[in-house]
Amino acid sequence: MDIFEAISKRYSHKERFLPDPVPIEDLIKIAEAGLAAPTGNNTQNVKLVILPDREVLQPLSEIVSTDGTKTAPTAIALFTDSNMRGDGHNFDMENYSAATENMLLAVTSLGYASVWLDYPFFDQNTQKKVLELFNAPAGLRMHVLLPIGKPDGEGSRRSKLPYKERYFINKF
């Protein structure tokens, strides 16, 4: 699947997943796509934890309980390391966003589905629990969880405004 097809087919899968395993080779491809994303001042401060099977994902799904986390056979957790700064600036949001989008496109191109889960990690209590669960070193913060798997049925897709209504050439 080329990049433009992956972009047009990608959607946020908020429903259940099939229990079919995702091969570790595919998870590594997805992770490497994320780590290939640009980072501010080349800080490369994005860290990933690959959760290759349901048994490992189960404790996290008790902290972050959604249809996706409860049924996905695999997931990737995305962290940034605040100890790594570029010229005194914090590029965490830009860095993890670029990595996440690359991974979502890789997920789609490999025939899987996922959803960008970030809202649970704004809560300090949840943040503390996940950092303990992953035995994360000091300075790391979890930002995103991508449950990954084959969708259990066709996922709902939100309609988008026509692109021609949202881009302009030279001026508005």
Q: What residues fall within each predicted segment?
A:
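Acidic, surface-exposed loops and disordered segments
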Residues: M1-F172
